[in-house]
Curated annotation (Swiss-Prot):
Molecular function per GO: translation elongation factor activity
Name of the protein this chain belongs to: Elongation factor P
UniProt cross-references to InterPro entries, sorted A to Z: Elong-fact-P_C, NA-bd_OB-fold, Rib_uL2_dom2, Transl_elong_fac_P/YeiP, Transl_elong_KOW-like, Transl_elong_P/YeiP_cen, Transl_elong_P/YeiP_CS, Transl_elongation_fac_P
HAMAP family according to UniProt: EF_P
Pfam families named in the record: EFP (PF01132), EFP_N (PF08207), Elong-fact-P_C (PF09285)
Metabolic or biological pathway, per its Swiss-Prot or TrEMBL entry: Protein biosynthesis; polypeptide chain elongation
Keywords, sorted A to Z: Cytoplasm, Elongation factor, Protein biosynthesis
SMART domains: EFP, Elong-fact-P_C
Family per similarity comment: Belongs to the elongation factor P family.
PROSITE patterns: EFP
Main location: cytoplasm
Cellular component, GO annotation: cytoplasm
Amino acid sequence: MISVNDLRNGMTIEMDGTVYQVIEFLHVKPGKGAAFVRTKLKNILTGATIETTFRAGEKVEQANVDRREYQFLYADQGVWVFMNNETFEQIELTEEQVGNAPNFLLENMTVQIASWKGQVIGVDLPNTVELKVVETEPGFKGDTATGTYKPAKLETGYVVQVPLFVNTGDVIKVDTRTGEYLSRA
């Protein structure tokens, strides 16, 4: 059990037999009355978000989420196959279980797979990945002065907005949490 005062973004808690991830939290101390914590929680199993208010000092159960390293092997007809780095056991995940991870997954990439009570609840990617641009409009001399962006298709098929100076064949860094271009690699 942990106090709601100790909640932070990304933590997982268990309420009503379901596991939730804390998306946002705000500790409020009104001028009159008791303090409280307002939270936005994401149901890990269904993806639904709820807003819940707790009294300050209230206790919640921290979910025991198991995270293990896996290597992405391949994708085939809506199934993504991963191999446990310790036991070499292979698991197959559905599109629902991998979420937006396929946008950034390359073969042989190491990821963390989170499970709760033996059920896979998500794939945790590194915060940034380096991907090759396979298709984009060519940049022209002098394009770097403007702050405009153009679409670029990456080797995974994901389309991201990049500055005009990025060309086909360039390797760029992409933030996996937001899906946005960060820099050239």
